[in-house]
Amino acid sequence: MSNRKYFGTDGVRGKVGDTPITPDFVLKLGWAAGKVLARHGSRKIIIGKDTRISGYMLESALEAGLAAAGLSASFTGPMPTPAVAYLTRTFRAEAGIVISASHNPYYDNGIKFFSIDGTKLPDEVEEAIEAELEKPLTCVESAELGKASRIVDAAGRYIEFCKGTFPSELSLNGLKIVVDCANGATYHIAPSVLRELGAKVIAIGCEPDGMNINEECGATDVRQLQARVLAEKADVGLAFDGDGDRLIMVDHLGNKVDGDQILYIIAREGLRQGQLRGGAVGTLMSNMGLEVALKQLGIPFARAKVGDRYVLEMMQAKGWRIGAENSGHVILLDKTTTGDGVIAGLQVLTAIVRNHMSLHDLCSGMKLFPQILVNVRFTGENDPLEDKKVQQITQDVEKELAGRGRVLLRKSGTEPLIRVMVEGEHEETVIALANRIADAVKAAG
């Protein structure tokens, strides 16, 4: 990916009120995107958002920019990111735009784009939009201005799509499920999907006020969900993040079930049903326990760079259909085109119902290795990762683990930090080894 001024790996993102997340810039972004997409024959764009208070402001700015470029916008209202990808496909729109900062606090927001097939825009299109941003804004003739409309029952359409990924011969009758929607975009989606499939649903995190999105709730903080699952004696808990593309689960004992475990369950069930095509893709941060468990099942496993974009790229390159990050991004290409928390949850619930097993028991075939992450701040000019002593100690630790553990050193993309990750079978050993490497990194930095 070339150097860019505004687009990151997940669109344009930042703090509301600071460039680039300002009304004037987003208007210009809408215009620039409109000009580029119009060259590809575009005339209709789908726009969705999560529940942040700033979404209304940014939505209006995007609409004005697109209209000035001659493109019409259809609005979904608050909807999960994967729902916008789905609606972009079904409405044959030329692109979809989501106003969201995913799992970030309410004072952040972002703009990300989907192409006509529901996948993220190609790099070259994003680069063309950046180039257009450098030009002065011009408006098309009045007769060519874009129009605005709302999609009738966007939520109902997406609810039916989600339900369609659950086997028609099964139901969730008899299951008590707690669902935490992070006061985000799934608040009016996930509870309805689960209830209509027969579950008894206890919903939390479903009262968005524009500022409580992801606040001590949802996939990034499952403590409320864990407590409620235990208090209600529920069978299972599901937690989504603010824009609904992540899923973390909780079993009936209150244990957290992360993206690695969810990927294991879905891969194992796919194998049992004869529906698994190829292997599974994780990331450099995926727990080694996942790799070991899949190997025991004879399922190939590959690691992509951290980021759902890179997971998807590797899946497409290998022709594989399932992949996930341990943070809860689960991509199931046989079901949809992007990470979808609700649909991922339904696939795990399918395994629970079909096998008459609890979530806890479905996870039992995979043992999570103790994983220790130490962040080391460095301020010197020297790169600690290039230091000979750091490299030697890292090699020594890898030899000591003898194939029953992993070492990963990587730089943070946002701070002057080296992240030291060590995992292995015994926690005390892992802690000692991680600290040994961290001390060497500190000395080098």
From Swiss-Prot:
InterPro entries: A-D-PHexomutase_a/b/a-I, A-D-PHexomutase_a/b/a-I/II/III, A-D-PHexomutase_a/b/a-II, A-D-PHexomutase_a/b/a-III, A-D-PHexomutase_C, A-D-PHexomutase_C_sf, A-D-PHexomutase_CS, Alpha-D-phosphohexomutase_SF. Pfam families: PGM_PMM_I, PGM_PMM_II, PGM_PMM_III, PGM_PMM_IV. CDD domains: GlmM (cd05802). The modification Phosphoserine is found at residue 102. Its cofactor is Mg(2+). Activated by phosphorylation. GO terms for molecular function: magnesium ion binding; phosphoglucosamine mutase activity; phosphomannomutase activity. Keywords: Isomerase, Magnesium, Metal-binding, Phosphoprotein. It comes from the Bacteria. Binds 1 Mg(2+) ion per subunit. GO terms for cellular component: cytosol. Its EC number is 5.4.2.10. Mg(2+) binds at residues 102, 241, 243, 245. Belongs to the phosphohexose mutase family. Catalyzes the conversion of glucosamine-6-phosphate to glucosamine-1-phosphate. NCBIfam families: glmM, PRK10887.1. This is Phosphoglucosamine mutase. It comes from Pectobacterium carotovorum subsp. carotovorum (strain PC1). The gene is glmM.
